[in-house]
Amino acid sequence: MEEKEILRRQIRLLQGLIDDYKTLHGNAPAPGTPAASGWQPPTYHSGRAFSARYPRPSRRGYSSHHGPSWRKKYSLVNRPPGPSDPPADHAVRPLHGARGGQPPVPQQHVLERQVQLSQGQNVVIKVKPPSKSGSASASGAQRGSLEEFEETPWSDQRPREGEGEPPRGQLQPSRPTRARGTCSVEDPLLVCQKEPGKPRMVKSVGSVGDSPREPRRTVSESVIAVKASFPSSALPPRTGVALGRKLGSHSVASCAPQLLGDRRVDAGHTDQPVPSGSVGGPARPASGPRQAREASLVVTCRTNKFRKNNYKWVAASSKSPRVARRALSPRVAAENVCKASAGMANKVEKPQLIADPEPKPRKPATSSKPGSAPSKYKWKASSPSASSSSSFRWQSEASSKDHASQLSPVLSRSPSGDRPAVGHSGLKPLSGETPLSAYKVKSRTKIIRRRSSTSLPGDKKSGTSPAATAKSHLSLRRRQALRGKSSPVLKKTPNKGLVQVTTHRLCRLPPSRAHLPTKEASSLHAVRTAPTSKVIKTRYRIVKKTPASPLSAPPFPLSLPSWRARRLSLSRSLVLNRLRPVASGGGKAQPGSPWWRSKGYRCIGGVLYKVSANKLSKTSGQPSDAGSRPLLRTGRLDPAGSCSRSLASRAVQRSLAIIRQARQRREKRKEYCMYYNRFGRCNRGERCPYIHDPEKVAVCTRFVRGTCKKTDGTCPFSHHVSKEKMPVCSYFLKGICSNSNCPYSHVYVSRKAEVCSDFLKGYCPLGAKCKKKHTLLCPDFARRGACPRGAQCQLLHRTQKRHSRRAATSPAPGPSDATARSRVSASHGPRKPSASQRPTRQTPSSAALTAAAVAAPPHCPGGSASPSSSKASSSSSSSSSPPASLDHEAPSLQEAALAAACSNRLCKLPSFISLQSSPSPGAQPRVRAPRAPLTKDSGKPLHIKPRL
């Protein structure tokens, strides 16, 4: 409630002040009063205050032939250039005077004005009438400085009926001051009130003497658009300004020229400067009819309360009731927002916003005619950043080009259909101001300066084509005739030329096309979607255009093929196999195709290749159709040529892979042929990829036994005995091998060790160092009579058909091959039974030892390898005498044990015992005595055997 009461009071004060000012200074020159006699800035509590003086010299001193020379001289910068310093100092003097308690020097035709924003979101605009009591010298000096400062003629810029005038004045951030007096009754005051649920209304209040000293903030709005002419009977609330308040920092540069600009009316009073508190507020004209029209003007204000980077189009048009439009995007809208914001209140040097005393008399837009209803477009931005000052300097272009060509590219898509007259009145749209021509805002944190030499083709479209606008949620596009998409935007990237942005691709244009006329740019998209081009939509969205369409396009016939043909060739060469029947219409049957293309041949680099499913074979012939060869060389526009290249590439890769594999197969692997090593021959012969080394062939077992009859070198096995090729001696594993020249390897291996796979192949390179069993017999089959691997087992499976015959009739351990093989195989079986029989072998008799060795099935299951037979036969002679001695020795040591053992074994092995027994009983004691130590010595090797 408190805020509402304050708002009402401010509205009353503003309205009364305006009415009093009009009654006092209607059509006469403003009466001169001391500048600081009655008005000081209001209380500065928490906001910012901007106070400025606006020198208003009479028009009669201006020349009428200077043109737009002010553009080269003045700009909106952080610190004004040299020529603008005197007015800037004048603008700050009143505040310094108010702060120091000294009245500022009165100047003739100087309006002092203050625009503030209270806490209740109300805009308060104070206007101090010009003083007459100034000294002649001061006014003369001021007049001279102003005439020197303002060189632009105003005779051709006087507003006609229904037109405004370019704003003039300066706005500079002032230091925080506290008012020590009250405003005089003559001070006009404009209050923009925002009531809940209603648009903001600007009213004038007369007396401000009792206005409360609330903290006020200076309005630094983004846009102000003012309509100069209205019907005398209508008070349209839709026309006026939008004094949008931004909650954070306010972009002052965008609104300063309009917010604090003045209007002069030449209806019979050309000498009298008529002040205006705000261009958007009710103007105080000097003419009677316009006074009647504009005295009761109600201006609709709209506040943008978004805290994001949201931008709106704010329009003041008598034809459209809409006052705001949403912008296309924050990035594009930011291009039209001046980044020079108000500085902190405690800083001395702040960004100064100069609405030039001689504002920029731009040419009106091409679509606006004299007498047409003027419309203004402004970007209204609300930025959440509360930056105190801006370090960027807005500098106008020094060139005399048309500044409309330096607008942002999105202005070409700006809504201009219902408001065609963009800049006909004096209040130019903000898009035409100099700050936007020099810089382009890419994001919130980065400002990129555009090159002054760039002339964007879409920039001239804001006034040329008043096409209907379509306002959508995501974009603001112009609807052009016969155009389905938005017009392409040409971006300027440094050192890379223009890049054409369309929906799906970025195309870099050559530097020669950096400066395109408007017609060429408008026809740029028409060429891209020419009716003569084919558009083939597939799953991958591939667009194929015939080369005749881009090559015959009239706007740029020379530079087009450089980038267009490249893109066409790229799009064709991507998915040629899928597109070929569609794009070329059965390209093999084309009338211009050579004969060899339809027969599965392809010409690659002038050489014919026959293309099959997986092979590309080169032919000796040359293509007879010579006319097609240049077409194939420039195959970027020839889908068949590109297809042949693609097929050739795949076929070549496949053929190379085949050759590589064949070469790898031919190479000799670093492995020995298992067939050659085991059997001495290989059926593949020289085609075998493995190594055939005669030194690694297995030893002939018959040669070891001395029974090989092929001693002339025809034996496929090796007659060179080496222990690397021989299996492990089974007697050595038992600990009973007494042959000093045993050809078998004497190596201790674990009982649990697996069979060496290399030895199975015929040769183990590790030899005696191998920790695996070097055997050719299957231990599982030898132990249990069955192998779990079955036919896949690589070891020998010897049957036990000779076991019963050997157990019944075998006279000695070694004469029969089956016995020898069984003993070799017994070395690979479990050795516990043999260990348990050692005491019986030492103490009772040799008959018990041999009986246990022969009768135990784990020791002698099945047969053994053929090499072991020779070993058994060779060791039989040496081992025949120790069993006999042991047999004679046993009864003398323990006859009872011998009798019990013999009684137990006689039934099992009667023939064996009878063979070992001596015929003469008297010879037994004689033989036993000398053989007793031998028995102890012969038993010692049994303890050497490891128990792993």
From Swiss-Prot:
Span of zinc fingers (C3H1-type): 667-695, 699-722, 723-749, 750-777, 778-800
PROSITE patterns, alphabetized: ZF_C3H1
One GO term (biological process): mRNA transport
Self-association and partners: Interacts with SMAD1, SMAD3, SMAD4, CPSF2 and CPSF3.
Protein's gene: ZC3H3
Name by which UniProt lists this protein: Zinc finger CCCH domain-containing protein 3
Feature: compositional bias, Polar residues: 405-415, 834-846
Record keywords: DNA-binding, Metal-binding, mRNA transport, Nucleus, Phosphoprotein, Repeat, Transport, Zinc, Zinc-finger
GO molecular function list: DNA binding; R-SMAD binding; zinc ion binding
